[in-house]
């Protein structure tokens, strides 16, 4: 695992470490005097205690000048910018690192370094490193490899990677090469380039060690050694830059990052051979180690980040490389004060963009170390040989990673607070908290297991029909993007023996209790120290690389109210019994694939927009996408009303609406109407009329006159009764019509509706003032009767034609003579009221244009009669007419045959679309007929204008069609739109465009555009 950089060491701790060494007065003189005497090359007079508070306290001492005098042949060409040190500081490092070589084995030795004391074993066999609790650094273990035949390589050089002397002899390189060949599978992808500057690299170290030791050596070896049984604080983990530097210097061909640690006997043999060695207090040794490590840390430029490979590698427990006596499980530990995931990612050679971990199928956090391996069993962890492991910073894989392949399961990072205490003493102090910590650890492990078993990536368990909690979706953890996750940190002081066993506990725990305990305990354990390390333990970081899930292991129950660590996706089970593809759909819909500015990971996501808005029972929770057959069956059972029967192709949607919307209560007057009997395009804005308005205006059919007269008489006689009956009784007559299997045409539908609903003129007189005041109703119901004068939209033409016919002795001012096509006549008062209620601004092109404006105005005023007071009925009729004209739904037809009736005309033009009104008027003077047809849609009207002339018979004159009632689109003086009109005014005083008809204007406008 890549360690932290030098910035992880806090200035306060550095200051205390260094001042601890300076204040040591066991030699009889002050620490500053001793240090100045021991290190004549450095001028420390310019430093005082205040200088140690800043990170640049050694900046003036020139530990790492940019321009180095060292020979470039020592380094490989790729490492030219790495650690460089001049000869002056090289002497200091050589003096400091050689001092511990003379420490006797039985007095201090590796006891000063608990990391080595428990990580090193007497075994010198290179093929037996045990499963380590922390994956050791490749460069560190390469330095810790057996070097019993090399006396020059000191113990501290192995610990601190003195880069001024990278290799002591060719034997060390040979050992490293041997390790490279034995563990090729352990090395991630790096170019195998062997550096052949062995003798050149050896020379600087020999030169630095040839310098005589100063008084510092005598001072450090003149004190009584501390007993070995008392372990000091673990030595600091070497900086990642130094590790990477040594890794590249010693040999880039070495693919083995895990050689066996050096045995204590080999390392301490040199110490026992020194007769002048004396006991050294553990505080001095600790301070010395910290000081040297501090100096080495500052020797590396900050801008250079190492490139470390981090791909998980297969590690089998049966491999000979993993079998070592238990004491070699522990290696030097990293104890940085603040853990940074970004630092971890940058320190590794990840084949992806680590700045966007949320774009990965598997989170990079799950593979922070390429050496994820099995935690040792509980009984072996509790052995006395591993007592000091309680001080370590562990990054361990979850309990199930026992296979030979890499484990991408979430990692748990644990750090111990009191790193300066001996391991045994700490274990004695923590015995009271073992049980509590063990329970928390078991909860964490089960949460890990629960997170690993989430579906969505093709795991075998998804094919077994397992269900997961549908209300939680894993969210990636990032303190930079999610401030709420900052305090979610866990510290455990639990000894290693108290950890849970490898297998997941068989009893099922409540997930809410687990997550609550985890978050509450982790927040309660926050320390005032600056060292807070996030626990990398989450379902979102569970891997998809482990496919050996045990189906017998229980899964925690679902949790209804997840915290910020979970993301609510859906309230139904998204993966009840779905296949891999459907599960992947849910995963892709999660936040892992979204950028943070779009959907922050801590913000709950909305429901699936494509999910049906139906509430399922607990047994009917299904995924919103791709429902299974049993899902459809379950859903259709309670909500049958949402599933309409399949319509026959010949039945229109309008009939279905009529069939299902016939149960409106009487008291719902003024509410929105679910449908319109007139099949309007604006059904949503129609209102429900009271029962008094039940027999509302609908389209009249072209059925025989006798039928209409009978219906009229029957409806007129039973009006008081029908107004009190529910609407469903009146609409039940519509049911036989849609049940008919033969294809129904629009005119047949309208005929059937007209037959059963009819039109009561007497009821309309009462309705207009009571129910037609609503603007929604006024602008929508354009479904008045077809052929009679009282139901006409555009009776202005009738008025003008009536005026013309009055001059000729024909009484058409009240109603045009339409006995051949009008089944029944309305009372004269009603017809007169409806006639004069129409606005003259909507006149068709057949109006008498020869009249002067004054004459026309006078006739309008006279013809309005009793309706000139502007009643709501008149306003309503005017509004409906203007709306139809403005939408271009009115077609004016000239030159009709003498025997043409409105019913026949309507039947012919129904081929273009639904007709709201059809009216035929007669001109007695010329014996010609003209008609108006109002379509439901303007598109149908336009189609009829273009192709209506083809509907005539052979013995009939040709039709002349144009849009009617478009006076507001024309000039004050206008001519008939019909180019063959005989009544057009002379165009002498008009411009070119005023004299042109509409079609000509349209063609010219189109030509001008091209």
Swiss-Prot record:
Q: Which Pfam families match?
A: RRM_1 (PF00076)
Q: Which UniProt keywords apply?
A: Activator, Nucleus, Phosphoprotein, Repeat, RNA-binding, Transcription, Transcription regulation
Organism whose genome encodes this protein: Rattus norvegicus
Q: What induces it?
A: Induced by combination of forskolin and dexamethasone in primary hepatocytes.
HCFC1-binding-motif (HBM), short sequence motif: residues: 681-684
Q: Where is this motif: LXXLL motif 2?
A: 156-160
Residue ranges for motif LXXLL motif 1? 140-144
The UniProt regions of compositional bias labelled Low complexity, in chain numbering, are 521-532, 782-794, 832-852
Which CDD domains does the entry mention?
Answer: RRM_PPARGC1B
Supply the name of the protein. Answer: Peroxisome proliferator-activated receptor gamma coactivator 1-beta
Provide the free-text tissue specificity comment from this protein's UniProt record. Answer: Ubiquitous with higher expression in heart, brown adipose tissue.
What subcellular locations does the record give? Nucleus
Q: Where is the composition biased (Polar residues)?
A: 178-189, 264-279, 369-384, 619-638, 659-670
Domain (RRM) spans 889-963
Principal localization reads: nucleus
Question: InterPro entries, from UniProt?
Answer: Nucleotide-bd_a/b_plait_sf, PGC-1, PPARGC1B_RRM, RBD_domain_sf, RRM_dom
GO CC terms for this protein?
mediator complex; mitochondrion; nucleus
- Phosphoserine occurs at which residues? 145, 148, 383, 628
Task: Please note every region of biased composition (Acidic residues).
Answer: 429-449, 795-811
Record remark on domains: Contains 3 Leu-Xaa-Xaa-Leu-Leu (LXXLL) motif, which are usually required for the association with nuclear receptors.
Can you cite a GO biological process for this protein? regulation of DNA-templated transcription
Its Gene Ontology molecular function terms?
Answer: AF-2 domain binding; nuclear estrogen receptor binding; RNA binding; transcription coactivator activity
Its function, per the record, reads:
Plays a role of stimulator of transcription factors and nuclear receptors activities. Activates transcriptional activity of estrogen receptor alpha, nuclear respiratory factor 1 (NRF1) and glucocorticoid receptor in the presence of glucocorticoids. May play a role in constitutive non-adrenergic-mediated mitochondrial biogenesis as suggested by increased basal oxygen consumption and mitochondrial number when overexpressed. May be part of the pathways regulating the elevation of gluconeogenesis, beta-oxidation of fatty acids and ketogenesis during fasting.
């Amino acid at each position: 695992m890549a360690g932290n950089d030098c910035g992880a060491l806090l200035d306060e701790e550095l200051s205390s470490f260094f001042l601890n060494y300076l204040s040591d007065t066991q030699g009889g003189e002050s620490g500053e005097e001793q240090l100045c005497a021991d290190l004549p090359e450095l001028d420390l007079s310019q430093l005082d205690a205040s200088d140690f508070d800043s990170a640049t306290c050694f900046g003036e001492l020139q530990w790492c000048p940019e321009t180095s005098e060292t020979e470039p042949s020592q380094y490989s060409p790729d490492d030219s910018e790495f650690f460089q040190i001049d000869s002056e500081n090289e002497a200091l490092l050589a003096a400091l690192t050689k001092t511990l070589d003379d420490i006797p084995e039985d007095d201090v030795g590796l006891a000063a370094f608990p990391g080595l004391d428990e990580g090193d074993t007497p075994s010198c066999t290179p093929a037996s490193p045990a499963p380590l609790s922390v994956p050791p650094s490749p460069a560190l273990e390469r330095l810790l490899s057996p070097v019993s035949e090399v006396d020059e390589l000191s113990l501290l050089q192995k610990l601190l990677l003195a880069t001024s002397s990278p290799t002591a002899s060719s034997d060390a390189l040979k050992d490293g090469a041997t390790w490279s060949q034995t563990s090729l599978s352990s090395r991630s992808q790096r170019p195998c380039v062997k550096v052949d500057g062995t003798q050149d690299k050896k020379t600087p170290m020999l030169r630095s060690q040839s310098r005589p030791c100063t008084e510092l050596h005598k001072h450090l070896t003149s004190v009584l050694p501390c007993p070995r049984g008392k372990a000091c604080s673990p030595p600091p983990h070497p900086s990642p830059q130094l590790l990477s530097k040594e890794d590249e210097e010693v040999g880039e061909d070495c693919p083995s990052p895990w050689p066996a640690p050096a045995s204590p006997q080999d390392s301490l043999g040199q110490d026992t051979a020194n007769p002048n060695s004396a006991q050294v207090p553990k505080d001095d040794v600790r301070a010395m180690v910290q000081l040297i490590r501090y100096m080495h840390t500052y020797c590396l430029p900050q801008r250079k980040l190492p490139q470390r490979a981090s791909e998980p590698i297969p590690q089998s427990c049966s491999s000979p490389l993993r079998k070592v006596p238990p004491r070699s499980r522990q290696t030097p530990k990293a104890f940085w004060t603040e853990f940074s995931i970004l630092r971890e990612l940058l320190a590794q050679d990840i084949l992806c963009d680590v700045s966007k971990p949320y774009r990965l199928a598997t989170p990079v956090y799950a593979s922070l170390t390429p050496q994820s391996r099995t935690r040792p069993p509980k009984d072996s962890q509790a052995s006395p040989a591993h007592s000091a492991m309680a001080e370590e910073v562990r990054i361990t894989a979850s309990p199930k990673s026992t296979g030979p392949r890499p484990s991408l399961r979430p990692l748990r990072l644990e750090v111990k607070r009191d790193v300066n205490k001996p391991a045994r003493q700490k274990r004695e102090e923590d015995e009271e908290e073992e049980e509590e910590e063990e329970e928390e650890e078991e909860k964490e492990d089960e949460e890990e297991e629960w997170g690993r078993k989430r579906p969505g990536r093709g795991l075998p368990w998804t094919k077994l029909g397992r269900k997961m909690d549908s209300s939680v979706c894993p969210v990636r953890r990032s303190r930079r993007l999610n401030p709420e996750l900052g305090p979610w940190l866990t510290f455990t002081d639990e000894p290693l023996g108290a950890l849970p066993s490898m297998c997941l506990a068989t009893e099922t725990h409540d997930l809410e209790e687990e997550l609550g305990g985890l978050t509450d305990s982790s927040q309660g354990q926050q320390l005032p120290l600056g060292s807070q390390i996030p626990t990398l333990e989450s379902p979102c970081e569970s891997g998809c690389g482990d496919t050996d899930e045990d189906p017998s292991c229980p899964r925690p129950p679902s949790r209804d109210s997840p915290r910020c660590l979970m993301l609510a996706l859906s309230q139904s089970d998204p993966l009840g019994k779905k296949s891999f593809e459907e599960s992947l759909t849910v995963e892709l819909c999660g936040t892992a694939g979204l950028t943070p500015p779009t959907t922050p990971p801590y913000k709950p996501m909305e429901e699936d927009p494509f999910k049906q808005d139906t509430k399922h029972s607990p047994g009917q929770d299904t995924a919103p996408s791709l429902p299974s057959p049993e899902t459809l069956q379950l859903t259709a059972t309670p909500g049958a009303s949402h599933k309409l029967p399949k319509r026959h192709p010949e039945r229109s949607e309008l009939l279905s609406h009529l069939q299902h919307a016939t149960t409106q209560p009487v008291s719902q007057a003024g509410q929105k109407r679910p449908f319109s009997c007139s099949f309007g395009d604006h059904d949503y804005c129609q209102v429900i009329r009271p029962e008094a308005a039940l027999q509302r205006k609908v389209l009249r059919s072209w059925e025989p006159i006798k039928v209409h007269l009978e219906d009229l008489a029957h409806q007129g006689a039973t009006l008081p009764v029908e107004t009190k009956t529910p609407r469903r009784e009146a609409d039940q007559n519509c049911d036989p019509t849609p049940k008919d299997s033969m294809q129904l045409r629009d005119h047949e539908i309208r005929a059937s509706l007209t037959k059963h609903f009819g039109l009561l003129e007497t009821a309309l007189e009462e309705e207009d003032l009571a129910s037609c005041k609503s603007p929604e109703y006024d602008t929508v119901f354009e479904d008045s009767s077809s052929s009679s004068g009282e139901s006409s939209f555009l009776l202005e033409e009738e008025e003008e034609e009536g005026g013309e016919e009055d001059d000729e002795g024909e009484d058409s001012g009240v109603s045009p003579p339409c006995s051949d096509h009008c089944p029944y006549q309305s009372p004269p008062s009603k017809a007169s009221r409806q006639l004069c209620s129409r606005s003259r601004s909507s006149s068709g092109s057949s109006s008498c244009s020869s009249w002067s404006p004054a004459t026309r105005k006078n006739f309008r005023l006279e013809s309005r009669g009793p309706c000139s007071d502007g009643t709501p009925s008149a306003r309503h009729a005017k509004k409906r007419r203007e709306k139809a004209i403005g939408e271009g739904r009115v077609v004016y037809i000239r030159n009709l045959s003498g025997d043409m009736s409105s019913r026949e005309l309507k039947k012919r033009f129904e081929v273009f679309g639904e007709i709201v009104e059809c009216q035929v008027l007669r001109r007695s003077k010329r014996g010609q007929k003209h008609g108006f047809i109002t379509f439901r849609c303007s598109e149908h009207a336009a189609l009829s204008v273009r192709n209506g002339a083809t509907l005539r018979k052979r013995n009939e004159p040709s039709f002349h069609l144009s849009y009617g009632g478009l006076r507001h689109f024309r000039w004050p003086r206008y001519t008939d739109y019909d180019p063959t009109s005989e009544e057009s005014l002379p165009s002498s005083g008009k411009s070119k465009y005023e004299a042109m008809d509409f079609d000509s204007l349209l063609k010219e406008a189109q030509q001008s555009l091209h």
